A protein has these predicted regions:
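Conserved glycine(s) of the Walker
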Residues: 15
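Walker A (P-loop) ATP-phosphate-binding motif of ABC ATPase nucleotide-binding domains
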Residues: 5
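Hydrophobic anchor at the beta1->P-loop junction of P-loop NTPases
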Residues: 8
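Short catalytic-loop micro-motif centered on adjacent basic/acidic residues
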Residues: 78-83
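Conserved substrate/cofactor phosphate-moiety recognition/catalytic segment
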Residues: 18-74
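Exposed loop/turn and edge beta-strand positions of beta-sandwich/beta-sheet ligand-binding modules
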Residues: 2
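The conserved Walker
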Residues: 12
């Protein structure tokens, strides 16, 4: 089977995370969420200004894409959740 990247996107508070987690559980695929990564980064490094908050969000997106490329590069599939 070819590797697949499933994108779960939608408006804020529309149930993206819930749907992505359910898909992950049902399909046995890893799930990456920008918000989960951003929260981890915030807990680790924090931010003090709007500019730093934006940079944290960009960093979270880049980390999510990097992790997805690693998973896909090994021939596995992955679920990405964000408001893209």
């Amino acid at each position: 089977m070819n590797s697949v990247c499933v994108l779960v996107a939608g408006m804020p508070a529309s149930g993206k995370s819930r749907m992505a987690r359910e898909l992950s559980a049902r399909l046995g695929l890893p799930m990456l969420s920008k918000d989960d990564i951003k929260e981890l980064l915030y807990d680790t490094v924090g931010f003090c200004s709007r500019e730093e908050k934006v940079a944290l969000g960009v960093g979270a997106m880049e980390a999510m894409y990097y992790a997805a490329r690693q998973v896909l590069g090994q021939g596995s599939s992955v679920i990405l959740e964000n408001n893209f």
